[in-house]
């Protein structure tokens, strides 16, 4: 009776496999431009654009986006994500169309997140 297999329960991490191959996946994930929406207070929202190539002038892109969509925005330096463009309002579809028409990013390299 002493030959019982007893398994001790341990903490299960569902993302362990995804994080294990992080070194190779990080280079591939940089190819995408992520357009997200963040809820602020009430009906207010914030659109963020992340993952643009570093050789682009973020301030010039922001200036064109603000002029095109009649909204305010800023470029934020994030320690983890790098430079991120923030725009007021839900501008996800507008931003993705603008980036494709301007030739900055191909349509298949844009990922839209939110709601």
From Swiss-Prot:
GO process terms (BP): regulation of translation
PROSITE patterns hit by this protein: SUI1
Keyword Protein biosynthesis: yes
Gene Ontology molecular function: RNA binding; translation initiation factor activity
Leader peptide range in chain numbering: none
Keywords recorded for this protein, A-Z: Protein biosynthesis, Translation regulation
InterPro entries the record matches: SUI1, SUI1_dom_sf, SUI1_euk
One protein family per Pfam: SUI1
Keyword Ligase annotated: no
Function: Probably involved in translation.
NCBIfam families, alphabetized: SUI1_MOF2
Similarity comment: family membership: Belongs to the SUI1 family.
Name this polypeptide is given: Protein translation factor SUI1 homolog
Gene source species: Zea mays
Designated gene of the protein: TIF
